[in-house]
Amino acid sequence: MERYDNAFTELKARKEGAFVPFVTLGDPGPEQSLKIIDTLIAAGADALELGIPFSDPLADGPTIQSATLRAFASGVTPTQCFEMLATVRQKYPTIPIGLLMYANLVFNRGIDEFYAECARVGVDSVLIADVPIEESAPFRQAAMRHNIAPIFICPPNADDELLRQIASHGRGYTYLLSRAGVTGAENKAAVPLHHLVEKLAEYHAAPPLQGFGISSPEQVTAAIEANAAGAISGSAIVKIIEKNVDKPDQMLTELRDFVTVMKAATRHA
C-alpha cells in the first residue's frame, strides 16, 4: 500500500501526474506478457494495473475481452498469473502494482487466501469490478488484514453518501470513472470531472486516477487539469497488443512509443 503513497509523493515533487497502463496478464502469452510489462515500465509507467483472465468479464468492452481470450488460449491460469506477479515484483521493487478483476476469482481461492497470496507476491491493490461498495466488507477487511489497498470505483453520478463511503473505505487510489458503461477506447472520456475530484478531496479520499476511454495525451492532460492525480489507460494499450499479435517486436516498439507520449502528457507545463 505504501508504494502508492510514495509514488504520488514523488510525482507531486516532480510536478507530474501518474500514467498507469492496464494489460491482462498472460496476453498474448506468458513470455511476451512479461516483455510487455518491462516495456511499459521502461517507457515511463508510474504504476501498473493488471488483469487476471476471467471467463465472464462484465465491465470490459470487446477489446479487453479478446485480451482475456488470448491469455486463455495460451493456457494462462490464475496460479501462473501470481507467479508472473512475483517475477515483476522481484524485478521492480518500488512500482505500485494493482489488480483489476472479478469476485469469482477471489471466491475460487477463498477471500482471505486470495489476499494473502496477493501480499506474498507483492501486489499493492485490488479492485473487484463486480462488487459494489455496499457489498465489499468481507473483501476490504481481508485486504486490510494483508496490507492490500482496496480500490473503489467512483462513477460520474456518485452522490455525497457514495463519495463518503469511497473516501472512508478506499486506500491507495480512487478509480475515477470518466463515464458509466463498459471500458474501451471506442467511447471517448467525457468532460473532466472537476466536481467529483473536489468532493473526493473534501472527504480525504485516496488520490483519484481517471480511467475508462483514456486513449490520447490530450485526455491525460485534461484529467490532470481537473486535478486528478493521473490517468489509467487500458483498451488503447490492449489494442496495440491485438494489432501486433504476430509481430512481437513491433508490438513492443508501438507500446513504448504510446506510453512515452502518454507519460509526457502528465508533466505540468
Swiss-Prot record:
Any one GO cellular component localisation term in the record: cytosol
UniProt xrefs under Pfam families: Trp_syntA
GO molecular function: tryptophan synthase activity
Catalytic reaction equation(s): (1S,2R)-1-C-(indol-3-yl)glycerol 3-phosphate + L-serine = D-glyceraldehyde 3-phosphate + L-tryptophan + H2O
InterPro entries: Aldolase_TIM, RibuloseP-bd_barrel, Trp_synthase_alpha_AS, Trp_synthase_suA
Metabolic or biological pathway: Amino-acid biosynthesis; L-tryptophan biosynthesis; L-tryptophan from chorismate: step 5/5
EC number: 4.2.1.20
Lyase in keyword set: yes
EC class (word): lyase
Active site (UniProt): 49 (proton acceptor), 60 (proton acceptor)
UniProt keyword list: Amino-acid biosynthesis, Aromatic amino acid biosynthesis, Lyase, Tryptophan biosynthesis
Keyword Lyase annotated: yes
Quaternary organization: Tetramer of two alpha and two beta chains.
Function noted in UniProt: The alpha subunit is responsible for the aldol cleavage of indoleglycerol phosphate to indole and glyceraldehyde 3-phosphate.
Family classification: Belongs to the TrpA family.
NCBIfam families registered for this protein in UniProt: trpA
HAMAP family for the chain: Trp_synth_alpha
Annotated protein name in UniProt: Tryptophan synthase alpha chain
Organism, as annotated: Enterobacter sp. (strain 638)
